[in-house]
């Protein structure tokens, strides 16, 4: 176990170092859903200009309108286009429909419009429509064949988007399995996707998990806020947020069927900033916390316990509010931006602006009296590694503990954890609960700074 902990910590630090080579003005893992069920949307050109002003690098469309695809030409934005569920029967029965679609909606614009994937349907396998379910794979195969005929088979991927309900079990994450009722259908679908190197697209929404269990602990777990965490009884991994738990449950389900190497893409996730007064969870503060902390978590490249050291491609839901959506009122209020291009809440998506939830690097100052957050004696390296991953995943500047940084030496898990745990405590508000870390931390009045390594405090 000790060797695994040291390896895990080292891998984390290596990936943390590598992330500095990526441009601060782009986040290649981050996309957004561009829904258009609204009567108050800005013009298409205004939307393109808005996205170009952000760090968002991908956009998912729910259709394939030629004007929209063309508008994103030469922008560098990667595009996912899609078929509605209602298109599936015709696609499945008539290969010519797929061929014509590829000719008119892909070849006419590619590569100037950087189309990277085509989604065939949304949440089909959990629709309950057995006929539609049986037609899904033939429809996808016809689209794939049309792309192959156009020499685009290896460049434009074919997938379909699933709800978390495709899993019959998701907790603990290591026990994740697909609904056995999907049986051969899911296996055939995964064989197709594996053969074509296509991603498995899923829509995890921690918001709905909180809605089903609205407790303060669940909210903190869903919003990436400090919490006691949950230990997976199957493998001992500790989870500090619901997003990682849901994604790893999908990974476990894929692994259980022999397809652990299929890439997982989060097709949509978000949190409503408004809703009816009787709805639990929607609020501006909760939406900002979830989306902002999710972005910081992805940016950190910590990954998940089962897929460490990488950022999963994630499409936020959604670009704008959609007042024509049906269902609960909250369904209308997932928008990141307002029609005038201003932010609904600021999570640092605009280029050349700092994420407001990401503290700046503290300026070293002379040591002074104050309070500092440090590990308790006797805490294991395993627990401290989890604290490092959590704190750095919240967006604090962990550069000083990277090789060459002022706090890299001594190169021990305990020393690195002490620095980042304190920095998180100071940045998060200096409340006692900001120095809890599942009861592995304590406050001290003794300044732990040493040499050039400065531990900031409230009085610094």
UniProtKB/Swiss-Prot annotation:
Post-translational events: Glycosylated. Contains two additional disulfide bonds, but it is unclear if they are between the pairs Cys-392-Cys-398 and Cys-407-Cys-453 (PudMed:18096638) or between the pairs Cys-392-Cys-453 and Cys-398-Cys-407 (PudMed:12392450).
UniProt xrefs under SUPFAM superfamilies: (Trans)glycosidases
GO biological process, one term: (1->3)-beta-D-glucan catabolic process
Expressing tissues: Expressed only in pollen.
Key words, A-Z: Allergen, Disulfide bond, Glycoprotein, Glycosidase, Hydrolase, Secreted, Signal
GO CC field: extracellular region
Active site: 123 (proton donor), 268 (nucleophile)
Record-linked Pfam families: Glyco_hydro_17 (PF00332), X8 (PF07983)
Region (Disordered): 352-371
Superkingdom in the source lineage: Eukaryota
Catalysed reactions, semicolon-separated: Hydrolysis of (1->3)-beta-D-glucosidic linkages in (1->3)-beta-D-glucans
Signal peptide: 1-26
Effect of pH on activity: Optimum pH is 4.5-6.0.
GO MF term list: glucan endo-1,3-beta-D-glucosidase activity; protein homodimerization activity
UniProt-listed Enzyme Commission number(s): 3.2.1.39
Compartments, record wording: Secreted
Annotated S-S bridges: 373-435
Glycosylation (residues): 355, 447
Record family assignment: Belongs to the glycosyl hydrolase 17 family.
Binding partners and assembly: Homodimer.
PANTHER family linked to this entry: GLUCAN ENDO-1,3-BETA-GLUCOSIDASE BG1-RELATED-RELATED
Domain notes: The N-terminal region (1-350) contains the enzymatic activity while the C-terminal region (360-460) can bind laminarin. Both regions are allergenic by themselves.
Protein name, entry field: Glucan endo-1,3-beta-D-glucosidase
Gene: OLE9
């Amino acid at each position: 176990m000790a060797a695994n902990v040291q390896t895990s910590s080292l891998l984390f630090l290596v990936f943390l170092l590598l992330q500095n080579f990526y441009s601060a003005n782009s986040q290649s893992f981050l996309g957004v859903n561009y829904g258009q069920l609204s009567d108050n949307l800005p013009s298409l050109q205004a939307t393109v200009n808005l996205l170009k002003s952000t760090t968002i690098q991908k956009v998912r469309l729910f259709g394939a309108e030629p004007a929209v695809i063309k508008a994103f030409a030469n922008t560098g934005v990667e595009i996912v286009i899609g078929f509605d569920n209602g298109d599936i029967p015709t696609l499945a029965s008539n290969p010519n429909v797929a061929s014509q679609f590829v000719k008119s909606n892909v070849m006419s614009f590619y590569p100037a419009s950087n189309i990277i994937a085509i989604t065939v349907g949304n949440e089909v396998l959990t629709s309950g429509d057995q006929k539609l379910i049986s037609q899904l794979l033939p429809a996808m195969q016809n689209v794939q064949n049309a792309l192959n005929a156009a020499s685009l088979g290896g460049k434009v991927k074919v997938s379909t988007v699933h709800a978390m309900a495709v899993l019959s079990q998701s907790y603990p994450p290591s026990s994740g399995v697909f609904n056995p009722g999907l049986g051969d259908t899911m296996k055939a679908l995964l064989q197709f996707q594996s053969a074509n190197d296509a991603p498995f697209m899923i829509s995890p929404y921690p918001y709905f998990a909180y809605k089903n269990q609205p407790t303060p602990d669940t909210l903190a777990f869903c919003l990436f806020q400090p919490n006691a965490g949950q230990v997976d009884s199957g493998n001992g991994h500790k989870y500090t947020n619901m997003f990682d738990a849901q994604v790893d449950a999908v990974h476990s389900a894929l692994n259980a069927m022999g397809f652990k190497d299929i890439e997982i893409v989060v097709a949509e996730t978000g949190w409503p900033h408004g809703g009816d007064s009787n709805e639990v969870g929607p609020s501006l503060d909760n939406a900002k916390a979830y989306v902002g902390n999710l972005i910081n978590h992805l940016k950190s490249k910590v990954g998940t316990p089962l897929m460490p050291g990488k950022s999963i491609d994630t499409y936020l839901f959604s670009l704008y509010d959609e007042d024509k959506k049906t269902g609960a009122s909250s369904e209308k209020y997932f928008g990141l931006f307002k029609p005038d291009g201003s932010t609904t809440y600021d999570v640092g998506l605009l280029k050349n602006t700092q994420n407001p939830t990401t503290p700046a690097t503290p300026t070293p100052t002379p040591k002074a009296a104050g309070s500092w957050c440090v590990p308790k004696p006797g805490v294991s390296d395993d627990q401290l590694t989890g604290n490092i991953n959590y704190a750095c995943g919240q967006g604090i500047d962990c550069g000083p503990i990277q090789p060459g940084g002022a706090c890299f030496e001594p190169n021990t898990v305990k020393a690195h954890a002490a620095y980042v745990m304190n920095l998180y405590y100071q940045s998060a508000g200096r409340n006692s609960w900001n120095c809890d870390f599942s009861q592995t931390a304590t406050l001290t009045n003794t300044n732990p700074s040493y040499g050039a390594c400065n531990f900031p405090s409230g009085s610094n």
